[in-house]
Amino acid sequence: MKIHRWNDTFIVPRGAYFEGHVHIEGDLLVPRDTHFWGRLVVEGDLTLGPRSTVGAGVWCANAIVGDHVRIRGPLVAVGDVLACDGAAIGMIRAARDVTLRPGVRVGDVVSGRTILVQGKVESGRLLGRMVKVVGATLP
């Protein structure tokens, strides 16, 4: 599978799938319907497009997880994490802020700063310096 490179950003073609573990030295943009059957390690920022899947854990600097993405293992970030509507994640561990949008299903969430829960989510324990829960009316 050919991955396109633009400066320090790697771009995966839509609908691609990867059978083994993937390690990217830079940022990674993943379009919708892309599948990783193994572990995904990104040394920069990760943007996972809608309806993508990761069969094992994800390690990255910052993460934006698109709607209805499924990550079967943990998501570990040294920065911020945004989990969009309907995402399913094994667990989240972030050094900075975590935002959970409506419909997210996640195990435990551990944050070094703030956990912002927008709307109704299914989760295990929420551990952070501050946990804010607001209605689903925010964009």
Model-flagged regions — what are they?
Residues 1-139:
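Extended beta-solenoid/beta-helix repeat architectures
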